[in-house]
Amino acid sequence: MKNGALFIKVALLFCFMTGCSFMNEQQEISKPATTLIQSQLTSEGQDLNNRMLIIGTGDMTGVYFSLGQRLSNMYEKYNGAVSGTQVTDASIENTELVSRHRAEIGFTSVDVLDLPETDKSKLRALTALYSNYVQIVSTKQNDIDSLDDLVGKRISVGTAGSGTRLIAERILLESDLPTDQLNLSYLSFSQSAEALRNGTIDAAFFSSGIPNNEIAFISKQTELTFIPIPGDIIERLQKQYGVYTYNEIPRDTYRGMKKNVQTISIKNVLVTYKEMSDPHAYNLVKTLYEHLPELQHAHPAASDISITEATKQVPLDFHPGAVNYFTEQGIIGNQ
């Protein structure tokens, strides 16, 4: 498991050994302790009571993390799960963690699911979520208004295990810019924002729900430029991959924006591993939708989550437990 921060809401081992109650604090768990806890608590049962539930998220300033934290709280509150969130590099790493049973559920963008390194046979979808918007950001002083202006510039394209890096590299490849004249760095959302602020990079890619917290913060400090994705590049990406949608970043998303910005969006999905029991998966989905307003309160991007869209635009087999829930709700027919 990645040596990132693993947040657990209770002191797991102590309380399970002694039956005590404990203060509700976030606690970092080392790899050996996490492995021990999982071996003791993740046997599948009829519900989530006292089950260890790790959620793969992303950068601590991103939407995945905000929603993961809220989901964790919901599963503890309504299902009695012992739940926590894992800070990761996001989509690509999350699919790896879930497929290896190092996390029970994880957030990912659908374009990651068809990568050669993604073993779809080990993964199952629980529900479609909201969409990520590709946001290519610079500061006004850099005079970068188009993709062509990125030649010779310092650009952050996201961390190695992120969907941001995947789509950034695909866009740059389709732009036909000379790769030897692009100075790329691989920074998280928070690192990219800080580097834009202090001038150590000239532009950064962010693929996230809107508004992105880091972009919103720096837009209050300096005037930003949002670089549009040309229509011909969008068309080629749609034709080649089939998972990208033409969209626009509304002009009221961030301070200082004067017009909508043409871009692409990518659907997000919540995934689990194939071996999760049907009742367990059913309860995960049921709790999410029965208490959806609580999740939507965690970040504005979650306002786009809708049960009527829960099974759309997901190139992955759904878990039978999720299918059972959506069938009960009349979203899909009997399967």
Question: What positions do the PLM features span?
Answer:
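Immediate post-signal peptide segment of exported/extracytoplasmic ligand-binding proteins
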Residues: E25-I55, E117-D119, D143-R154, P320, ...
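N-terminal (or domain-start) structured segment
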Residues: I37-F107, L115
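Pocket-lining segment of extracytoplasmic ligand-binding domains
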Residues: S109-L113, D119-K120, N142-D143, T179-V271, ...
